[in-house]
Structure formats: structure tokens, C-alpha cells
């Protein structure tokens, strides 16, 4: 999205093209600094000459977020950037995976997210459950956001192969204070759930700068009742009818029948995962400018979450009692339910609760001489100080688990899990050369213990602090890197950026325990330490063909090492049972991007061809080359993704003050070679849509009023790998619950600036009430927003 409301004159546009593609472009290539064109941080200092940029950058400013985007979370601010989407299934979703050109909606370790250079990405796993820690940034403190596409900069790790998001937060230059209140809600209708789900958000912040000292203090509170995230469903028992006395007859008037993703009939029995989340963020930043050329800043962020996941059963017996569950482990008559003469089991109607407190510490030291040499140090520590999750195991069919007598269940304690990062970088400006070199260190630590087994659950799912050990998983990974990158202005129209990143990775202290393992399989496994080194070269050549036309070709390799959980944790995931494999090899990505950017009299048009070959891709699949077959996360020999992205920014379209920004992306992603499951060769990589599009139209009616109408589209994609057993994909019915469906969604927002201090806005997301899903979870339906803001 464009950074500015008014489109500059032609000469300025030509200069912008030169900045983006050929000239010294941006400190965005550094983890902690904004682009020179960003209106995101005003410090009053002299800005150093920028580091040339080898990749495409798209950005959105705080002003654009305020006037055109309905969001109360940092993740929501990215939804109109080209080929970019955050899997935010409801407001306050902790599993909001960042999706860009080439990664799926459950591949969280293939993109990288920073806030002021501090890493927010959670590389403990590559899963829907380890999304970036968006909650550490309040949307009101965002000054601007930039996205970088591809592994073309040596300054970032191999996890950046899918892309990089850099959030820059506010740094005050004088006293300022802000207060904002948001209300939002939806009337949600799906199956047997017809209800209103609403919430509120409040934030307050203040900052100041006096004699070189500056500070920022903010608090953010979110309270939201989310809509159901899953719907319990079942199919009829085959074979002999259930024995007399083992079943409960269910009133068929309450039964909801449906067709699943495979085109088969099913019965919807319950709604679950109805999450009431209360999240609080406290952020404190303190900095000091020792001189115009040296600044230090410390950051402390605390995020707390209290979540209650409730359930609702649609089934009633002849007396009107709610029937929650039925299965083999229950006493008669709740081994089955009988509906119109057919017998069914009913499961998954289990409530949950989680309590979390996470701490983030950051330190930035940066020189800013603007001369021949500058340097920067960024250190961060993320600590899951408390992370407890509880799930009930109902003891009979009429017990929801939320009554006066609490049944048993499971408790998972991930407290102490976390990561730390350190980067030290220098920049040398030597005539036609700008040289960046640095060192990097990171360490990730997994601690996860689950108490309560099927036969010996914890005594009280809400109150017990321990119980029979079910599983535990421990392990650490560490990466150390050296990198160098040289930007050489060969001639006024030619810029060559070349670099490389040498990484040494090791995995150690890995172990897990599973009470369910029976002899001869050991219950406790301890894994040998591993180490590996890789080199990733980068090359980019830019050419300013004319004052308004710029070209760039970029080549880059990225190495994405296995996460701690992929190697050392055993867990269940959608569509497959995934087991750990400590011998997994790193993904090796070779990417290309070919860019043409044309400045127009009233804007910009960019076209990008992108290409990615991924070797040893880490994917959950079934290994059919061994007997018995093994379903787990495995290395797949080769994946290929290629596509075209077109983006544009236009100002004063048809009438003064009407700005249009948009993008269209086509991608084709297939499995090229898979020795462990050859039947998958030539089939689609799941969760990569064929088409994506965005369009944002903002009319600045006056200095006080603006109105925005936006559009989001995502096309066909599969929710799982090709099913070689049936010779077809599992989702021929792709737009129902359980699928990763397409969507076509309109949003609108009206902003009114009452005066210099006060403003208010009203908005609607999903104007058409479009129903769409991300296997299996439904996205929000029509959602209304209202906001009131005060700025001092």
C-alpha cells in the first residue's frame, strides 16, 4: 500500500522508482530500521545513507491503517498487502499464521516477523499453533509496516524465504498521549449456532522526549467472544446395530444434516472452540540519545491471556436433556446415540481453558553518523513465563465438563519455552560500495509436559496442577551465522547487490516421553545431538532503464532448519498424525524474482515473476516406501512454486482525493519429486491458492472525512495432500466446513476527524456475509466496528 495520500509529481515518481529498484534504497534491509520514504518514525536525527535493497518491498503506514482498515490487532493491518494474509480466524486469535506468496496457512516457520528489530516469529514449530506473537504489538503503537518478499537479503535467516514483515513502532519527539476505544460484533449463523459474538478493545499510551531521553508507555486490553471454531460431526455406524441399552435415542428434530468436503453425508452434532479471550499488553520503551550519532533503547513487553473455550451440543434426548458425548468408553446408554434408526458415536464436545503470561525483553544500540561507518546491536529474549492449557474429558454423555462437578482431563504446561536472538551488524560506505557485515546468534528451547492419560486423567481438569505423566518433550536448537552483503553502484543506472550467509546450526538436549508406548517401544527416548553448516548466496541486479522504468533480477538461497518441535515433539495435527523425527534435514530454497516497475503520471505499476525450488521440504505425509507405512513430518525431495504478481497504486482516479491500490497474484505449486510417496509427484502443495487479489479504494472527501471500500479474494486450494489411495483429492466439495475454501469479501470504513484531538470511525468487514473456512475453522461473518480516539 502506498505510504502517502497525495501522489507526487512525475519527477518525484521517477526518483521513487530509482529508490525502489536501483539506488540506495532502504534500511529496511536491516532488521530494525524504516525505509527513508516511510513516515513511520520521526526522531529528529540525521538519517544515515540507506542500505541498498535487493527485494520487493510493500508498506502500509499508520495513517492508512487508521483510515482504511478495520482492525484491533496488529495482524489485521496486513490484510490488503499483495500476496499477504494473516490466518486470523477471529479477533484475538493466537494462531494467526502469516501467509505470503509461497507458504501455506499452517507453515509458520517459513516467514519472519520483527517489531523494531525484535523477533516476534515463533520458530519453535512449523505449525498453525506457533504463529508470530502479534499480541506483543498494539495496533495503536504501529508507525508503519513493511513486507519484503523472498530470501534475497543476507541479513535475514532462511526462514525469510517466504517473506519478512517489519513493524516499526512509534518513537516520540515530544509529549504525546493517545486513548482509543473499539467495539465490534457479529451476528453469526452456522448450523445450530445462531448467536451474537462481540467484544471490546481499549488502548492508552503516552510518550515524551526530553534532553535526549525518550520513553513510551502503553497498555492494551482486548476482550472478545469468538464464534465457534469447530463443529463436531459424525457418520453412521456400519455393521450390526448397537446392542439394546447401549444407546440413547436422540430427537431427530434437532439433527442437522450436511455434506462434507468429500461429498459424503454427515451429521453436525455440536459447536466447539467458542473462545472467550481476554488479552492484556503492557509495553515500556526507554531510550537515550547519547549524541546525535548514538542511541540506546530498552524494551519490555508483557502479554497476558485468559481463554475459555466453551462448547454447545445440538443433540437432545427424549426428555430434552442435552447429549454431549457418546462413545465406547462411556457407560450404557451413552456408547451410541440413535438417530432415525442409525447409530452414531459423538465426540469432541470438550471445553478448554488456557492461561498465559509471556515476557519480551529487547535492547537496541545504534550508531547514526551518516559517515563512512555505522553499527547496530539488537538483542531480544522471549520467555513463555506461564503457559498452561487444560482440556476436559467428560465422564458421561450428559456432562459438558462445565458443571458443578468437574470431570478429569489433561493439563499441558509449556512454561519456560522461549527463544533469544542477537545481531551485531556494521555498515561501511566506501565510495560506490555499501558493505554490510554482521554476526547472528539464536537459541530456541522447548519445554512441554502433558499430564493426564485416557485411563488416568488428572482429577479435576480445572483445578489439578499435576497428575499421571502422559507425554513430555524437551529440546533446543541454536544457530550462529556470519553474513556479508555488498551493494555496488556500478554505474548511475546499474546496481549490483551480492552477499552470502554462512550458518552453523545444532540441535541438542532432545528427548520425549510417551506413556502410550507399549513394549518393545520405549516410553522415553533421548536423541543424539546434531550439527550442520550451510552457505546461502544472494545476488540482485537492478537497472534504471529510463526515468520512469526500472528492472530488477534477484536470485537467492535460504536454508530453513527444522524446528525444535518438528524433531523432538510428538503431537496430533490436522489430517495426519505427526510424529517427531530428530534426523530431519533442513529445507533448502532456491528463489528467483524478476521485477518490472513503471511509474505512471498518477501512480505506479509493478509486475513480479517469482520462482521457488524447495528441496527437502518439510511436510506431513505418509511414507509408503516402508512397511508398515509411517505418517509423520518428512523431507520431500522437491517442491516447485512459480507465479506472477501485479500491484498498483493510483492517486486522484477520476476525481481529486480518490486513491486506488491493489494487487493480483497467480501461483502454481506442485510436488516435483517424492521418493517416499511417488504417487504425490505432480500434485498440488496444499493451502497455496491459485489466485489472490486485493483492491482498496479510499476517497478523501475532505480533510475531516474519508471513506474506504476494500476487496479481498482467494481462490481454489486443497486442504490436504492428494489421496493416493483413492486417486483423488479429499475435497471435491471445497466450499464447506472442513475445507480451505475460496473467499470473495468486501469491507468498508468511514473515518471522521472531529477536530485535531478527536476522531471516530465506523466499519464493516465481510459486507456480504460470505461464509468461508480454513480447514476446518470458519472465518468471521459480517462484523461491525465502531471506534472513538483521542490524541493529545
Predicted regions and their residues:
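Gram-negative outer-membrane beta-barrel transporters
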Residues: 180, 489-496, 504-505, 602-614, ...
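Short acidic/polar hinge/loop motifs at secondary-structure boundaries
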Residues: 120-151
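Transmembrane beta-barrel wall of Gram-negative outer-membrane proteins
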Residues: 195-310, 357-370, 431
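N-terminal periplasmic "start-of-domain" segments of outer-membrane beta-barrel proteins
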Residues: 36-69, 94-97, 125
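Face-selective signature of the C-terminal outer-membrane beta-barrel domain
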Residues: 287-303, 345-514, 542-544, 606-609, ...
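Extracytoplasmic beta-strand/coil segments of soluble accessory domains associated
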Residues: 75-119
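Outer-membrane beta-barrel signature, preferentially recognizing the C-terminal barrel domain
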Residues: 346-360, 368, 470-479, 527-536, ...
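Surface-exposed extracellular loop regions of Gram-negative outer-membrane beta-barrel proteins
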Residues: 445-454, 458-463, 504-519, 529, ...
Amino acid at each position: 500500500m502506498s505510504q502517502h495520500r497525495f501522489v507526487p509529481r512525475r519527477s518525484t515518481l521517477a526518483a521513487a522508482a530509482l529508490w525502489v529498484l536501483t539506488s540506495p534504497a532502504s534500511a529496511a534491509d536491516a532488521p530494525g530500521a524504516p525505509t527513508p520514504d516511510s513516515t513511520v518514525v520521526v526522531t529528529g536525527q540525521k538519517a544515515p545513507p540507506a542500505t541498498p535493497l535487493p527485494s520487493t518491498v510493500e508498506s502500509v503506514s499508520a495513517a492508512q491503517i487508521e483510515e482504511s482498515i478495520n482492525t484491533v490487532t496488529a495482524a489485521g493491518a496486513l490484510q490488503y498487502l499483495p500476496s499477504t494474509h494473516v490466518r486470523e480466524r477471529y479477533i484475538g486469535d493466537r494462531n494467526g499464521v502469516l501467509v505470503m506468496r509461497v507458504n501455506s496457512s499452517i507453515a509458520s516457520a517459513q516467514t519472519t516477523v520483527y517489531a523494531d528489530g525484535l523477533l516476534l516469529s515463533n520458530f519453535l514449530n512449523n505449525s498453525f499453533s506457533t504463529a508470530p506473537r502479534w499480541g506483543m504489538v498494539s495496533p495503536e503503537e504501529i508507525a508503519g509496516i513493511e513486507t519484503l518478499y523472498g530470501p534475497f537479503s543476507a541479513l535475514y535467516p532462511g526462514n525469510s524465504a517466504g517473506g519478512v514483515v517489519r513493524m516499526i513502532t512509534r518513537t516520540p519527539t515530544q509529549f504525546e498521549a493517545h486513548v482509543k476505544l473499539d467495539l465490534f460484533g457479529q451476528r453469526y449463523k452456522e448450523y445450530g449456532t445462531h448467536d451474537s459474538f462481540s467484544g471490546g478493545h481499549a488502548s492508552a499510551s503516552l510518550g515524551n522526549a526530553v534532553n535526549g531521553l525518550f520513553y513510551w508507555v502503553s497498555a492494551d486490553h482486548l476482550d472478545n467472544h469468538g464464534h465457534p471454531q469447530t463443529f463436531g460431526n459424525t457418520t453412521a455406524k456400519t455393521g450390526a446395530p448397537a446392542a439394546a441399552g447401549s444407546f440413547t435415542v436422540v430427537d431427530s428434530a434437532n439433527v442437522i444434516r450436511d455434506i462434507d468436503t468429500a461429498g459424503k453425508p454427515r451429521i453436525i452434532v455440536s459447536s466447539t472452540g467458542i473462545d472467550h479471550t481476554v488479552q492484556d499488553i503492557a509495553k515500556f520503551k526507554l531510550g537515550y540519545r547519547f549524541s546525535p550519532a548514538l542511541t540506546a533503547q530498552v524494551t519490555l513487553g508483557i502479554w497476558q491471556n485468559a481463554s475459555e473455550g466453551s462448547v454447545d451440543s445440538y443433540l437432545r434426548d427424549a426428555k430434552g436433556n442435552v447429549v454431549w458425548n457418546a462413545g465406547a468408553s462411556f457407560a450404557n446408554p451413552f456408547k451410541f446415540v440413535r438417530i432415525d434408526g442409525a447409530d452414531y458415536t459423538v465426540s469432541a464436545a470438550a471445553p478448554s481453558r488456557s492461561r498465559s503470561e509471556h515476557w519480551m525483553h529487547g535492547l537496541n544500540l545504534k550508531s547514526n553518523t551518516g559517515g563512512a561507518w555505522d553499527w547496530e546491536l539488537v538483542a531480544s529474549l522471549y520467555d513463555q513465563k506461564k503457559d498452561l492449557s487444560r482440556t476436559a474429558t467428560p465422564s458421561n454423555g450428559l456432562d459438558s465438563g462445565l458443571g458443578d462437578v468437574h470431570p478429569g482431563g489433561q493439563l499441558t504446561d509449556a512454561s519456560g519455552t522461549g527463544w533469544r536472538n542477537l545481531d551485531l551488524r556494521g555498515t561501511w560506505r566506501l565510495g560506490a560500495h555499501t558493505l554490510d557485515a554482521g554476526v547472528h546468534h539464536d537459541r530456541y528451547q522447548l519445554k512441554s509436559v502433558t499430564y493426564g492419560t485416557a485411563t488416568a486423567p488428572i482429577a479435576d481438569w480445572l483445578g489439578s496442577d499435576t497428575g499421571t505423566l502422559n507425554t513430555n518433550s524437551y529440546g533446543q536448537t541454536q544457530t550462529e551465522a556470519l553474513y556479508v552483503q555488498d551493494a555496488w553502484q556500478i554505474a548511475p543506472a546499474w546496481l549490483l547487490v551480492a552477499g552470502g550467509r554462512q550458518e552453523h546450526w545444532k540441535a541438542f538436549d532432545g528427548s520425549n516421553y510417551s506413556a502410550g508406548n507399549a513394549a518393545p517401544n520405549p516410553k522415553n527416548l533421548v536423541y543424539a545431538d546434531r550439527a550442520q553448516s550451510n552457505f546461502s548466496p544472494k545476488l540482485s541486479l537492478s537497472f534504471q532503464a529510463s526515468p520512469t522504468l526500472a528492472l530488477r533480477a534477484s536470485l537467492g538461497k535460504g536454508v530453513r532448519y527444522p524446528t525444535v518441535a518438528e524433531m523432538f515433539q510428538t503431537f496430533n495435527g490436522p489430517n495426519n498424525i505427526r510424529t517427531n523425527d530428530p534426523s530431519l534435514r533442513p529445507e533448502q530454497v532456491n528463489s528467483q524474482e524478476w521485477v518490472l516497475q513503471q511509474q505512471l503520471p498518477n501512480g505506479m505499476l509493478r509486475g513480479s515473476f517469482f520462482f521457488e525450488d524447495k528441496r527437502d521440504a518439510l511436510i506431513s505425509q505418509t511414507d509408503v516406501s516402508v512397511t508398515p507405512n509411517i505418517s509423520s513430518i518428512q523431507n520431500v525431495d522437491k517442491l516447485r512454486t512459480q507465479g506472477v504478481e501485479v500491484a498498483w497504486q493510483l492517486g486522484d482516479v477520476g476525481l481529486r482525493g480518490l486513491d486506488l491500490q491493489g494487487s493480483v497474484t497467480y501461483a502454481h505449486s506442485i510436488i516435483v519429486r517424492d521418493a517416499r510417496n511417488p504417487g504425490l509427484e505432480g500434485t498440488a502443495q496444499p493451502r497455496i491458492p491459485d489466485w489472490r487479489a486485493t483492491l482498496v479504494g479510499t476517497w478523501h472527501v475532505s480533510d475531516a472525512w474519508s471513506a474506504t471500500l476494500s476487496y479481498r479474494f482467494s481462490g481454489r486450494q486443497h486442504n490436504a495432500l492428494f489421496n493416493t489411495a483413492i486417486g483423488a483429492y479429499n475435497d471435491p466439495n471445497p466450499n464447506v466446513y472442513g475445507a480451505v475454501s475460496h473467499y470473495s469479501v468486501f469491507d468498508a470504513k468511514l473515518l471522521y476527524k472531529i477536530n485535531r484531538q478527536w476522531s471516530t470511525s465506523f466499519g464493516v468487514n465481510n459486507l456480504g456475509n460470505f461464509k468461508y473456512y480454513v480447514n476446518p475453522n470458519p472465518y468471521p461473518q459480517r462484523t461491525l466496528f465502531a471506534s472513538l480516539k483521542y490524541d493529545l
